[in-house]
Amino acid sequence: MKLRAPFALPLLATVFVLLGLHLPLAAQTPAPKPAPTGFHADLLKDFKSNSIISGSGSPVPLKRIADKKYLFFYFSGKYCAPCKIFTPKLIEFYKKHAKTGNFEIIFISEDPDADTMRQYMSEASMPWLALRFGDPAVKKIKDRLQQKGFPMLFLLDENDELIAKPELGDGDHVSWNPVKVWQKANNLPVTHWKFDYKALQGH
């Protein structure tokens, strides 16, 4: 028996249902993407999808930050003499603990332009991430941390609370304090680093 058009579509839909299939009778609106989960939800509100970059300049997914409990923000610049001494020491710390640690370091450039920033990251062989030069989030983070100089290192916990900032102590470089705070929080031996200002000669 030949089915008339008015009865064909309902019957076809019934067959699809019995087979466990869905008949696409009308286009549906795509479901909204779920909100990012993890740490640093408050901080990441100010970040765009391309705000964070690798040493090569490629965008890095924000999830890489959200997966880390602690965040270090490192302010530095290519033409800063003290930075030339502090940066290698920080790289040494990063390479020793990054694979097993629960932190990430984000470099914020104090250089005059993006090209100089890229040169600095390349020449220093920085292994960590960076905030894209000129990104709107830069000013917000500076205001949040009340950063007024460099080299400066700050440490935030998973709730984006500032738990360590540069300060004098035991003769260490002022920005070594956040490293010691992180070591204490993770039950690791606290290392001290005496900053030799005489080493600035020739830089």
Predicted feature locations:
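N-terminal secretory signal peptides that target proteins for export/translocation
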Residues: M1-P6
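Bacterial N-terminal signal peptides
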Residues: P10-P24
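N-proximal helix/coil linker or "cap" segments that precede and/or mark the start of modular domains
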Residues: A26-I53, W176-P178, W193
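A short beta-strand-turn-helix
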Residues: S49-Y70
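Short pre-active-site segment immediately N-terminal to redox-active cysteine/selenocysteine motifs
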Residues: K69, S76-Y79, G149
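Conserved redox-active cysteine motifs that mediate thiol-disulfide chemistry
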Residues: F75-I91
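Thioredoxin-like thiol-disulfide oxidoreductase module
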Residues: P112-G149, F154
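Thiol-/selenol-based redox modules, centered on thioredoxin-like
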Residues: E158-H203
